[in-house]
Amino acid sequence: MPGMSSESGGGELVLFSTKEKTPVLYPLSYGLKSPVHRLSISWGCGNNLRVTVLRNPELRDDDDGEVGGKVVNVRLSGEDGEISDPQWRRIAYGSVSPFALLQSRRNSISSLSKMDMSSSLYQTAWWEYVMEYSRDIKSLLSNTISLPAPLIEDPRSVIKNAEEPTSLKAAWELMELFYADKTCLSWLPERLVDWLSEYDILLSSSHPTIYSKLQDFQKELVGLQAIEDDPRYWEVMASALSVGWLEIVVKLLHLHGSYQLDQLGHRETENGLVEAVAVLISKMPRMRPQLEDGKFGECSAAKPDFMKTRERWQSQITKLECSAFWVQCAHHQTREGLRNMLKIMIGNADCLRAATCNWMELFVSHLLYLRPFTKGLDGMHSLAQKCVQSKPVNTSHKLLRLLIGILGENTEVVLAECSKEFGSWMVAHAMELLTAGSEEGEVLVHEEQRKLGGINMEELHRLVYAQVLSSHALTWQIAPIYLASCEKQGLGLLELLFYRQPVQENQMLIKSLEICRLYELSNVSAKLMKISGVHHWKHGRKGSGIFWLQQARDENCLSVIAQQLFDSVGKSLSDESLKQWEGLVELLGSESQISGGLDFLHKYRDFKRSLKVVHDGKTIDAAHEAVERLVSLMKSPSTPQRFWLPLLHDSLKLLNWPERSLLNVTQTNLMLNKLQELSIARLRPGFIESELSAQAVGSVRLALATNLGRAFLEEC
């Protein structure tokens, strides 16, 4: 049964070997000539170890010009390093937009399907969106820089010089091929031929391949005079033909010595046989809708048309095999080499096995020549197992392990291989392909797992990838895209991600607040602003602290700050102390609801400014304005009691205004009542006495009494 392990596996979902593995050795290049005295090892970002290599300080010579130590990052991962860190970041940022668009479309289609949309329309629309998503990702994984084409093509160049593809793109195309792309179901074998022609170079790192044979032969090609006399010439052509690389085979055939002008006269029959085989190869039937320009073969989109074309083509091969011209061909290598190629085109299993180098190439050759109508994964998996037995290998390439998992419809193996060999990015993004074409994958990925805290596999792998992103300073800001798509634990981890960011950096904080705004996390943004405000205040940046606490609308913290500020001002309010906190008062503004007790300082600042205008000899209007501010201060509950008497003493000029009384009876009684409250408060423990002298207090009382009498007379 697909997806189940054998009895010998002990019941594991994914087979696990208990054999001891050889320890992995990581090179450490630190570049110090002197002996290492000490090592310090700590975790870096992601799977990086930060190794600090230190010299012996006692043996250090300042004149040797060598540094005292080096810090080296060692990456602990199964990746082969074919993709550099900048390329990984480009892929990470480039995949955000397609991923977010697909999630948005998923939500839209899900809403429509609950209303009017039929299931068939839903599946069709979703498949189109997944394919568009896959094409965007595949374009992102392609090499952005292509090598320029040569101005003059070398006639003996068999393999084009191109930048080596990546295993990540090869794995993505395999996932797309078998899970998402429904248009290629009828010509799946041909798609595998195309896949192998592009990525056989990757298999060369761990397997003997046809590509490596061609590459080695091309190096020797320049020095060969009579190419048809070399057995490797016929060997590489048979190998290339077995996997459908027709253009290479035809080009190599045209390098045959019988095509040279000085040879045509006495090698006419030999040349005719070579040309006949070349024509048959170029006319080979292909079960596919179309071919790219420059590719050989006759395409047939429908099975009946392909069968007719193939029968006619095979009859031509049989007719050529029985031709009498073979007897007239005097060149032994040419005769045997061409006949071997005819056997390959007929589908001789022994010839196909001899021509291929590994089981994947043998698998593709069988699909191309023996089983071109293979569709189901069951048949392909059975054929792949036979090919593996026919051409066993000690170590299997990661792409081939992934292919075996796909053909075996073993979703657990596919996920395990993607995670182990291609990293968390691959699993998080390929999950959409896996669930698009596999019912088993859909169930496995979206089934809630108790052992995972109630989340499903899809959410788990997105959380893992988001954690990788958040561990790096250059990618943390795109982690919220993936966390927001996780319904169960995403928002909680997103909140933790914001709390981990350095609050002392305003740009980082503003970026976090913007992300919170996008995802409507107002509670989180308020906490972030509060944390930042407290941090700035404690580290002496009082203005920034008050600003962020105001933005967070935290009245409690602002009240505490107000008390601290009052304590720092002291028992009296002088012009010198006013200058120290005047900037903070300016920052507070007039929003007393969110300023706590600091509202008093704002009002006092305005009162002092008005009083200064009065002392400068301005008009009566300035004096009235100063009185209004004084009354407002004395009425305000935010004005501390210990400041009442200093305020009245500062206002003696207003109380003793020579022309008329500036305070009416009610206002003067208010001031006298405040003095009475101060007299009673002196009897309580903990009262803070003013620094004013008794004479100053008497002056205030006399001024208020005089002003009260004048006010009575004026109002009568």
From Swiss-Prot:
Taxonomy, superkingdom: Eukaryota
A cellular component term, taken from the record's GO annotations: nuclear envelope
Subcellular localization, as worded in the UniProt entry: Nucleus envelope; Nucleus, Nuclear pore complex
One GO BP: mRNA export from nucleus
Main location: nucleus
KW Protein transport (keyword) present: yes
Keyword tags: mRNA transport, Nuclear pore complex, Nucleus, Protein transport, Translocation, Transport
Subunit structure: Part of the nuclear pore complex (NPC). The NPC has an eight-fold symmetrical structure comprising a central transport channel and two rings, the cytoplasmic and nuclear rings, to which eight filaments are attached. The cytoplasmic filaments have loose ends, while the nuclear filaments are joined in a distal ring, forming a nuclear basket. NPCs are highly dynamic in configuration and composition, and can be devided in 3 subcomplexes, the NUP62 subcomplex, the NUP107-160 subcomplex and the NUP93 subcomplex, containing approximately 30 different nucleoporin proteins.
Biological role stated in the UniProt entry: Functions as a component of the nuclear pore complex (NPC).
Family of this protein: Belongs to the nucleoporin Nup85 family.
Protein name: Nuclear pore complex protein NUP85
